Amino acid sequence: MANTVLRIGIVGCGYAARVHLGRLSALDRVLVVGCADPDRGAAESFAAQASASSASTSPVAAFTDHRDLIKQCGADALAIFTPHLSHYRPAMDGLQADCHLFIEKPLSTNVQEAADIVGLARGRNRKVGVGHQYRLLPSLVEARRRLSAGTIGPLRLVTATLAQGWLATHGGAENSWRFDPKVAGGGILADAGDHLLDALLWSTGQVAVETAAVQHRLESGLDVVTAAVVRLAGGTPVTLAISGVSPGQLFEIIFFGERGRLRATDHSLLEELGDLPAQAVPLAEGGPSIDENFVAAVLDGSPLCCPADEALDTVRLLEAIARSAATGQAVRLA
């Protein structure tokens, strides 16, 4: 685009928005022009914080309705950090107003809404980036490169695990929405597990075509444990394990090929070839943040870290896993 500064409106003024604000405020080519949250106090507090960190002398405007933000602030882009079930309406309204979008993951919690966003963005020629920042991890970037190069031979099996004390560590009033399926659209699967699903699909370069799953749910319907088997388009089977009631933090994907295997975590990559001992793979330094990636994509035309059409594949798998667990039947995606 011709502008040298990206005018961004923030929709949803909770914890995630404040984290992203810290990174956006450090970028010379960004101006936060307004914010919206149904909680007026949250919107005004965020606006004050954004104004204090801005180089502009104009205060950041606060609204309780994202439509007023769109109408009054002249934003080039919206960054959406609402609870998951509330992504759709501001995304569609923003696209209708010719705004580019950054949407915190997941793109949506159901395939139809995600497809609507992708279709409208394509029709309006707008960029939509989704917050799957695990794609920027040096360990996964290098694993993807080695898989594409065939370093471990044909891929025969993948195991993917995410375990954390999600239920215990996301307490407090501000994060209480995460534990209400009617607001969040699900539990650990959609809230953190989708990072694992997206990393799996992105690193292998394949989409999922079939899955069968079981879940443990609380009385409220909140899923806290998911186990699934997935078949990728190339025929490779995958086992998935996601727990939100386990202490510590584990993110691990193991890729088994005919000539060796790769073990990727969020901070390391091990490679084993043949019968040789495992070797730590040297990793590059981390690159731009996902926020910087989005700004560069809009202003310079560089590639998005996670464009919406790719995030749609993750939503398809997320929805299929949830449906399989609910029905007790395998679900085909294609």
What are these regions (language model features)?
Residues 1-2, 77-79, 233, 296-334:
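C-terminal helix-rich "cap/oligomerization" subdomain common to oxidoreductases
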Residues 119-127, 141-157, 233, 257:
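Basic phosphate/pyrophosphate-binding loop/patch that engages nucleotide-derived ligands
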Residues 197-268, 290-303:
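Contiguous beta-strand/loop segments that form the cofactor/metal-binding neighborhood of enzyme cores
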Residues 103, 128-130, 159, 264:
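Hydrophobic residues in well-ordered beta-strands that form the structural core
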Residues 41, 280-292:
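Active-site loop of classical SDR/Rossmann-like NAD(P)-dependent oxidoreductases
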Residues 134-212, 328:
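Predominantly a Rossmann-like dinucleotide-binding segment in NAD(P)-dependent oxidoreductases
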Residues 20, 58-120:
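Beta-loop-alpha module in the N-terminal Rossmann-like domain of NAD(P)-dependent dehydrogenases
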